Every structure is written in C-alpha cells, then in structure tokens.
C-alpha cells in the first residue's frame, strides 16, 4: 500500500525555532510521505531583525499572499495538510484559492478568524484556551466548523510534547482507518 502524502507548513519561525517539528516528523514519517515547507521561505521573507513583531508584519504585509501563491504552484497532488499558526492560515487560504486538500489539521491559525469561507475539505482546528487571538464560538458556528479548545495552553501549544502526541495520534488513526477500509474493500 502506498503512503498517503502529508504536507507540513511551519509556523512563522520556520526551521529557526522549529526543533519541535522533528517530534512530529518522528511520529509521522513512517506512515506518510512528507513534504515540509518553512513558510518564511515560501513567503520570501528575509527580515533583518527577526523579532515576533517584524516577522508578523512581514507576513501580514504580503507574505501570506506570496506563500499562498508559491504553495499552489508547488503542490498539485491532493494531500493531507498539517499546519501551525501562520502556516495554517496559508494552507486555509490556498485551499480557498483552489489547492485541493484531502484534509487540513491546523493548530493555532488565529488569522483565520478574519475568513468568511471555510476550506473544501475535512478540517480540524485546534487552539489553546489562553490564546487571546483565537476565533470565538460565534465565528465557528457561522462557518459550521468545530474547534477543539485545549485547556491551560496558549498560542504555541503545538510545541508541547503532550499536544504533539495527541495531534499525531489523530493523524495516525486516520491512516489506520483508511487502511482498514481499503482491506475491507479489497
């Protein structure tokens, strides 16, 4: 059986502060054919002083749109997506612009709160309860989307080993479910 493809989009820090990404890769690489994107590179962002404010501004002032365009150019095969923070917003917007996705698991994509349309795929959103910028319940009801709110965590919950394990378990259970269905059908 061939592996399903999983595209992973980093948060705004990319690989610079992304040692936690290796934990996701460790869990998932034997079950998925993985493509990883550092969203700073996708967005052509090269700010001299990489403070959170400067990086955030660079993404908001055109970087997100650039990354969306580059992602659409690079990805043509329908795949599953796992995306973090701004990477989740990029994946969301790319899907709305026609990038075909089998599923989207987005953790802390707070800027999606400004979106009026939802992706055309199975979507799982996860936010920390203490993330001041997460969308509210009214937004998720309006878009008919379920949000998982994790108690006692903030925006960067995706870097925590417990959350990493939980997210990977969700993605792996989906693989096992698909394999089970394929065996039954075959």
Model-assigned labels for residue ranges:
Residues 28, 98-99, 114-121, 140-143:
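Short, conserved loop/helix-junction motifs that constitute active-site signature segments
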Residues 90-94, 115:
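Hydrolases whose catalytic domains are alpha/beta-hydrolase-1, hotdog thioesterase
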Residues 124-127:
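Short beta-strand/loop motif that positions the catalytic acidic residue
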Residues 134-146:
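Conserved loop-alpha-helix segment in the C-terminal half of the alpha/beta-hydrolase fold
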